[in-house]
Amino acid sequence: MYQNILVPLDGSDNAYMALKHAVKLAQTFKSKLFLVNVIDITRLNAYSPAAYGGTLYTNLLKVAKDNSQDILDRGQQMASAAQVESLPIQVNSSPKASIATDIPPKYAIDLIVMGKSGTNAVSRILLGSTTAYVVQKAEVNVTVINTIDDPD
Protein backbone atom coordinates (compact mmCIF):
# COMPACT_ATOMS: atom_id res chain seq x y z
CA MET A 1 0.00 0.00 0.00
CA TYR A 2 2.75 2.46 0.94
CA GLN A 3 6.11 2.20 -0.81
CA ASN A 4 7.86 5.37 0.35
CA ILE A 5 7.22 6.86 3.78
CA LEU A 6 8.58 10.25 4.81
CA VAL A 7 9.37 10.71 8.50
CA PRO A 8 10.39 14.23 9.60
CA LEU A 9 12.75 14.09 12.58
CA ASP A 10 13.56 17.08 14.78
CA GLY A 11 15.07 15.27 17.74
CA SER A 12 11.89 15.39 19.85
CA ASP A 13 10.42 12.37 21.61
CA ASN A 14 7.30 12.84 19.50
CA ALA A 15 9.30 12.56 16.28
CA TYR A 16 10.87 9.30 17.44
CA MET A 17 7.41 7.99 18.43
CA ALA A 18 6.33 8.75 14.87
CA LEU A 19 9.39 6.91 13.57
CA LYS A 20 8.50 3.83 15.64
CA HIS A 21 5.04 3.88 14.06
CA ALA A 22 6.52 4.37 10.58
CA VAL A 23 8.91 1.45 11.13
CA LYS A 24 5.93 -0.82 11.90
CA LEU A 25 4.17 0.36 8.76
CA ALA A 26 7.33 -0.17 6.71
CA GLN A 27 7.66 -3.72 8.03
CA THR A 28 4.02 -4.44 7.17
CA PHE A 29 4.10 -2.95 3.67
CA LYS A 30 7.79 -3.58 2.84
CA SER A 31 8.22 0.18 2.49
CA LYS A 32 11.31 2.35 2.41
CA LEU A 33 11.64 5.14 4.97
CA PHE A 34 12.90 8.58 4.06
CA LEU A 35 14.13 10.26 7.22
CA VAL A 36 14.35 14.03 6.92
CA ASN A 37 15.77 16.67 9.20
CA VAL A 38 15.28 20.23 8.03
CA ILE A 39 17.70 22.85 9.27
CA ASP A 40 15.49 25.92 9.56
CA ILE A 41 17.69 28.34 7.66
CA THR A 42 15.25 31.19 8.30
CA ARG A 43 16.14 31.07 12.00
CA LEU A 44 19.85 31.01 11.25
CA ASN A 45 19.52 33.99 8.93
CA ALA A 46 18.91 36.15 11.99
CA TYR A 47 22.65 35.67 12.60
CA SER A 48 23.65 36.37 9.02
CA PRO A 49 27.21 37.23 8.08
CA ALA A 50 26.03 40.72 7.11
CA ALA A 51 24.69 41.40 10.60
CA TYR A 52 27.18 39.58 12.83
CA GLY A 53 30.12 38.61 10.67
CA GLY A 54 30.76 35.28 9.03
CA THR A 55 32.20 33.46 12.03
CA LEU A 56 29.06 33.36 14.19
CA TYR A 57 26.85 32.25 11.30
CA THR A 58 29.36 29.64 10.16
CA ASN A 59 29.67 28.24 13.68
CA LEU A 60 25.90 28.12 14.19
CA LEU A 61 25.41 26.41 10.83
CA LYS A 62 28.05 23.81 11.69
CA VAL A 63 26.39 23.08 15.04
CA ALA A 64 22.99 22.80 13.31
CA LYS A 65 24.39 20.41 10.68
CA ASP A 66 26.13 18.27 13.30
CA ASN A 67 22.94 18.10 15.37
CA SER A 68 20.94 17.26 12.26
CA GLN A 69 23.32 14.43 11.41
CA ASP A 70 23.06 13.05 14.96
CA ILE A 71 19.25 13.07 14.68
CA LEU A 72 19.35 11.29 11.32
CA ASP A 73 21.91 8.76 12.57
CA ARG A 74 19.66 7.87 15.51
CA GLY A 75 16.71 7.48 13.14
CA GLN A 76 18.69 5.24 10.81
CA GLN A 77 19.81 3.09 13.74
CA MET A 78 16.19 2.61 14.80
CA ALA A 79 15.17 1.63 11.26
CA SER A 80 18.17 -0.63 10.79
CA ALA A 81 17.50 -2.42 14.09
CA ALA A 82 14.07 -3.31 12.70
CA GLN A 83 15.59 -4.34 9.35
CA VAL A 84 13.86 -1.50 7.52
CA GLU A 85 15.60 0.32 4.69
CA SER A 86 15.98 4.05 5.26
CA LEU A 87 17.48 7.02 3.48
CA PRO A 88 18.58 10.11 5.44
CA ILE A 89 17.81 13.52 3.95
CA GLN A 90 19.28 16.73 5.36
CA VAL A 91 17.79 19.96 4.01
CA ASN A 92 18.56 23.63 4.68
CA SER A 93 15.23 25.34 4.15
CA SER A 94 11.82 26.00 5.65
CA PRO A 95 10.59 22.86 7.45
CA LYS A 96 6.96 23.45 6.50
CA ALA A 97 7.42 23.71 2.75
CA SER A 98 10.15 21.06 2.61
CA ILE A 99 8.05 18.43 4.36
CA ALA A 100 4.66 19.29 2.84
CA THR A 101 5.42 20.08 -0.77
CA ASP A 102 9.10 19.92 -1.77
CA ILE A 103 10.33 16.49 -0.68
CA PRO A 104 7.28 14.25 -1.37
CA PRO A 105 7.28 14.53 -5.18
CA LYS A 106 11.08 14.34 -5.38
CA TYR A 107 11.13 10.93 -3.66
CA ALA A 108 7.69 9.61 -4.73
CA ILE A 109 6.47 9.74 -1.13
CA ASP A 110 3.00 8.29 -0.59
CA LEU A 111 2.71 8.79 3.18
CA ILE A 112 4.09 11.24 5.73
CA VAL A 113 4.24 10.04 9.34
CA MET A 114 5.04 12.77 11.83
CA GLY A 115 4.70 13.76 15.45
CA LYS A 116 1.95 16.02 16.69
CA SER A 117 4.42 18.63 17.92
CA GLY A 118 8.13 19.13 17.88
CA THR A 119 10.93 20.68 19.86
CA ASN A 120 9.83 24.31 19.49
CA ALA A 121 7.87 25.33 22.62
CA VAL A 122 5.98 28.09 20.84
CA SER A 123 4.86 25.65 18.14
CA ARG A 124 3.64 23.17 20.75
CA ILE A 125 1.07 25.68 22.04
CA LEU A 126 -1.18 24.68 19.16
CA LEU A 127 -1.24 21.43 17.21
CA GLY A 128 2.27 22.21 16.10
CA SER A 129 2.55 24.79 13.39
CA THR A 130 4.64 22.58 11.11
CA THR A 131 2.32 19.61 11.58
CA ALA A 132 -0.78 21.71 10.93
CA TYR A 133 0.79 23.16 7.79
CA VAL A 134 1.79 19.73 6.47
CA VAL A 135 -1.68 18.30 7.11
CA GLN A 136 -3.23 21.21 5.18
CA LYS A 137 -0.77 21.46 2.28
CA ALA A 138 0.57 17.96 1.59
CA GLU A 139 -0.85 16.18 -1.44
CA VAL A 140 -0.17 12.78 0.13
CA ASN A 141 -1.68 11.12 3.19
CA VAL A 142 -0.39 12.34 6.55
CA THR A 143 -0.49 10.29 9.74
CA VAL A 144 -0.03 12.34 12.92
CA ILE A 145 1.27 10.51 15.98
CA ASN A 146 0.33 11.71 19.45
CA THR A 147 2.64 11.57 22.47
CA ILE A 148 0.83 8.62 24.04
CA ASP A 149 3.37 6.19 25.49
CA ASP A 150 3.98 3.20 23.27
CA PRO A 151 4.42 -0.11 25.15
CA ASP A 152 6.93 -1.36 22.53
Predicted regions and their residues:
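Residues in the short beta-alpha loop(s) of Rossmann-like NAD(P)-binding domains
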Residues: 39-41, 92, 148
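Gly/Ser-rich helix-loop-strand patches that form or flank binding pockets
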Residues: 104-152
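A short acidic, glycine-rich active-site loop
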Residues: 55-70
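Small/aliphatic-rich secondary-structure junction motif
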Residues: 3-55, 78, 86-87
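Aromatic/hydrophobic pocket-lining residues that form π-stacking "cages" and hydrophobic walls in ligand
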Residues: 22, 75, 99-100, 134
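Structural beta-alpha unit
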Residues: 77-112, 152
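Short, well-ordered secondary-structure micro-motifs
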Residues: 18, 45-48, 99-101, 124-126
